[in-house]
Design a protein with these regions (language model features):
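Short, surface-exposed tryptophan/glycine-enriched loops
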Residues: 159-183, 341
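Secretory targeting and sorting signals
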Residues: 1-34
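Conserved active-site-adjacent core of cysteine acyl-enzyme catalytic domains
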Residues: 91, 100, 284-440
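Residue-level detector of short, conserved catalytic/binding motifs and their immediate flanks
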Residues: 110-112, 116, 126-128, 186-188, ...
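A short beta-strand element within beta-rich, extracytoplasmic domains
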Residues: 107-120, 355
């Protein structure tokens, strides 16, 4: 099981500099191992539905399509829910749902992360679930991957604990097969809820998922240059360290806010690229929050997972971006070569990394789970990052940093499996998928 499942992913953890021996132990010990690293296939596939024609391919129950969004039509039933983080009262909701076609991956997969973009007026919320064909030929149960609402007027957004069985479990936001088990298909269901008798409705504009079957390797070779050398995107730098102690009810404040800080940086970038399009919160939304960079505090409050007790739920972050008309989803990339294609297209990435203090030169810290923004590449192919940890210095000026390409690839690809948030306006096209590779965006 990959380090991506360590759910202290959004908290920095200093590592003693004497950990050199442990780092050395990760290095290849033979030519055979090095060859294995080069040849190991990284199976990743992503698929989404985001248009009227896409949604027509699925099965609707109590939902209808207006424009390119799903919404509740004539409800198919009702559901009673007691918010475990609310006042303890039970509310009854009208329900509609949409179920995707069955997706066959073509390989045995062991992890799946879903994505959705939805707007949820007060009194409404959505739930994502998945089922699939197990390696023994049986169909799995439905696993709940998240209950989402923009604010807390409806429910407190949350992952759902204690869903494990002999096939798989849900690790916060990720379906994870048990050791020695796998699945070969997946099928998503998004359920839409509104208070019974209300005429309001959530609207869902994107439903998708990434499934992966990855080799168990500890080190990868640096990937070939991908053509983005010398390109740097103007992503604004925000330091999570500035927010130490802010709103400790949200996972003890800014020290743990790497994910929403990174997401806020990408939203800030798109706001600068397209002024007036509303690709982020308005000043009135965060006017009462603690300065500076109050939009970071706002992002933290609005990505917070009440079960996980943290702001590092991956699809909650991309769903937050989706509130503002951006398209956001979670996938895995196979290499920095693939990441370069996004930079060439003008799209920064948020990526999940993990490393000991001496494994990423210039970071100045170690972490068992962290997120940062890839904003470009130097002429020689090293990574230009906006690292919200900012060398543990509470200063936005310390956020931009250049990291060695080979080192960066090895704290990203083998550790989180190459997790990336892809956030972009519909008007900015994604780059083409790599020819001959399974489509992972």
């Amino acid at each position: 099981m990959h380090v991506s499942r360590v759910h202290a992913r959004s908290t920095l953890a200093l590592v003693a500099t004497g950990a050199l021996a442990a780092a050395t132990a990760l290095a290849p010990t033979s030519a055979a191992l090095a060859k294995k690293e080069v040849s190991a296939v990284r199976h990743i596939v992503y698929q989404q539905w985001d248009s009227a024609s896409d949604f027509a391919a699925g099965t609707a129950s109590g939902t209808t399509v207006v424009g390119d969004t799903l919404r509740i039509g004539t409800p198919s039933g009702q559901f009673s829910y007691t918010d475990p983080f609310g006042a303890g009262t039970t509310a009854t909701y009208d329900v509609g749902s949409w179920t995707s076609p069955v997706v066959t991956t073509g390989f045995p997969y062991t992890e799946l992360v879903s994505s959705w973009n939805a707007k949820t007026p007060p009194g409404t919320w959505v739930q994502m679930s998945v089922r699939g064909l197990a390696d023994n030929g049986s169909t799995s149960k439905d696993y709940i991957l998240g209950r989402w609402a923009e604010g807390t007027e409806s429910i407190h957004r949350t992952s759902v604990p204690v869903q494990g069985d002999d096939l798989a479990s849900v690790a916060i936001d990720t379906l994870v097969a048990k050791k020695g088990r796998s699945l070969s298909t997946w099928q998503l269901t998004v359920s839409l809820y509104r208070l019974a008798g209300s005429s309001s409705t959530p609207t869902v504009s994107l439903v998708g998922a990434m499934a992966s079957g990855l080799p168990d390797v500890k080190k990868v070779n640096a990937s070939p240059l991908g053509g983005a050398e010398g390109i740097e995107l103007a992503v604004p730098p925000y330091s999570q360290e500035i927010h130490r102690g802010h709103y400790p009810e949200f996972n003890n404040g800014g020290e743990a806010w790497c994910s929403p800080t990174s997401t806020a940086m990408v939203l800030g970038y798109w706001q600068q690229q397209f002024p007036g399009q509303g690709y982020g919160p308005a000043p009135a939304d965060y006017a009462d929050l603690i300065p500076p960079d109050q939009w970071v505090d706002y992002a933290a409050a609005n990505t917070y997972d009440w079960n996980y007790d943290g702001t590092g739920n991956w699809p909650f972050n991309t769903a937050y971006a989706g509130r503002y008309g951006l398209e956001g989803f979670v996938t895995r990339l196979r290499s920095l070569t693939e990441a370069e294609q996004f930079i060439k297209a003008g799209i920064p990435l948020v990526v999940s990394v993990s490393f000991k203090q001496n494994e990423l030169t210039g970071a100045g810290y170690g972490t068992n789970g962290h997120l940062m923004v890839i904003r470009g590449f130097t002429p020689s192919g090293d990574v230009i990052a906006n690292d919200p940890a900012s060398h543990l210095d509470p200063n936005d000026a310390s956020v931009r940093v250049v990291y060695n390409r080979a080192e960066f690839e090895n704290v990203w690809i083998p550790k989180s499996g190459g997790i990336a948030y892809v956030i972009h306006p519909e008007s900015v096209s994604l780059p083409p998928n790599v020819p001959g590779a399974e489509p992972n965006w």
